[in-house]
Amino acid sequence: MRLGLCVVALVLSWTHLTISSRGIKGKRQRRISAEGSQACAKGCELCSEVNGCLKCSPKLFILLERNDIRQVGVCLPSCPPGYFDARNPDMNKCIKCKIEHCEACFSHNFCTKCKEGLYLHKGRCYPACPEGSSAANGTMECSSPAQCEMSEWSPWGPCSKKQQLCGFRRGSEERTRRVLHAPVGDHAACSDTKETRRCTVRRVPCPEGQKRRKGGQGRRENANRNLARKESKEAGAGSRRRKGQQQQQQQGTVGPLTSAGPA
């Protein structure tokens, strides 16, 4: 009799423990499920009770908002002002612009739109356009004056010396750039550009005809110089002769003084 009562007591105790454990397990599952449904907002695939959304749907962007000392993830269809969208195969993100006073940016260090009242110049925001630039067409974007549009450098020309291509070893060669387009109303600001450098070539004798022409030209130049010297000397001698003649004439006209009296 006692043995039967003990068996019944053990069976009842085991049944009670089983029911209790099932109830606790069911309560835990319901609590986790409830917390998950409250933390994950629409468009969020993975979330945390502490940090909000951890992963958004493929077409949405995740933005980390600061809440006291925590960062909470939020899923958005587009990034707010001051952020730019960074698309990634894993997850699209909104990244804050690092440029001061920037409202929209292309990357973290290149602004595309400044806050109201500020001027945009080369991806930065300024209270006024920097020196050498001005706002274009009433906008808030600064631009530098139009530059001269030049052609590419031409190939280097032949090595020459005094317009000769022979009879020397060291000479010079040059190349040029031409104006393709000048700023409107300021054509004087642009001009063709020439660049010269020294060159060394193997000495090539000049053809006989060119030598004779060169020699004849040299003789003519020497003859002209000699003629000029001769004319200069003759002019100097003539000037001295004329001066001597004038002095003699002056001495001949001056005679002794005589006094006039009654005969």
From Swiss-Prot:
Residue windows of the FU repeats: 34-85, 91-135
GO terms under biological process: positive regulation of canonical Wnt signaling pathway; positive regulation of protein phosphorylation; positive regulation of Wnt signaling pathway; regulation of receptor internalization; Wnt signaling pathway
GO CC, any one term: extracellular region
Keyword tRNA processing listed: no
UniProt effect for mutating residue 87 to A: Nearly abolishes activation of Wnt signaling
PTM note: C-, and N-glycosylated. N-glycosylation at Asn-137, negatively influences its secretion and enhancing effect on Wnt/beta-catenin signaling. C-mannosylation at Trp-156 by DPY19L3 is required for its secretion and regulates the enhancing activity of Wnt signaling.
Subcellular compartments: Secreted; Nucleus
Gene3D superfamilies with a match to the protein in the record: Hormone Receptor, Insulin-like Growth Factor Receptor 1, Chain A, domain 2 (2.10.220.10), Thrombospondin type-1 (TSP1) repeat (2.20.100.10)
Recorded consequence of changing residue 137 to Q: Secretion of RSPO1 is decreased. Increased Wnt/beta-catenin signaling-enhancing effects
Keywords: Disulfide bond, Glycoprotein, Heparin-binding, Nucleus, Palmoplantar keratoderma, Repeat, Secreted, Sensory transduction, Signal, Wnt signaling pathway
Region called Disordered, residue ranges: 206-263
Effect of residue 66 to A: Strongly reduces activation of Wnt signaling
Positions with biased composition (Basic and acidic residues): 218-234
GO molecular function: G protein-coupled receptor binding; heparin binding; signaling receptor binding
Domain of life: Eukaryota
Resulting phenotype, residue 66 to W: Reduces activation of Wnt signaling
Signal peptide start-end: 1-20
S-S bonds: 40-47, 44-53, 56-75, 79-94, 97-105, 102-111, 114-125, 129-142, 148-190, 159-166, 199-206
Domain spans labelled TSP type-1: 147-207
Effect listed in the UniProt record for changing residue 71 to R: Strongly reduces activation of Wnt signaling
Family named by the database record: Belongs to the R-spondin family.
Domain writeup: The FU repeats are required for activation and stabilization of beta-catenin.
Disorder: Keratoderma, palmoplantar, with squamous cell carcinoma of skin and sex reversal: A recessive syndrome characterized by XX (female to male) SRY-independent sex reversal, palmoplantar hyperkeratosis and predisposition to squamous cell carcinoma of the skin.
Other observations noted: Upon injection into mice, it induces rapid onset of crypt cell proliferation involving beta-catenin stabilization. It also displays efficacy in a model of chemotherapy-induced intestinal mucositis suggesting possible therapeutic application in gastrointestinal diseases.
PANTHER family in UniProt: NEUROHYPOPHYSIAL HORMONES, N-TERMINAL DOMAIN CONTAINING PROTEIN (PTHR46987), R-SPONDIN-1 (PTHR46987:SF5)
Protein name per the record: R-spondin-1
Species name: Homo sapiens (Human)
Gene: RSPO1
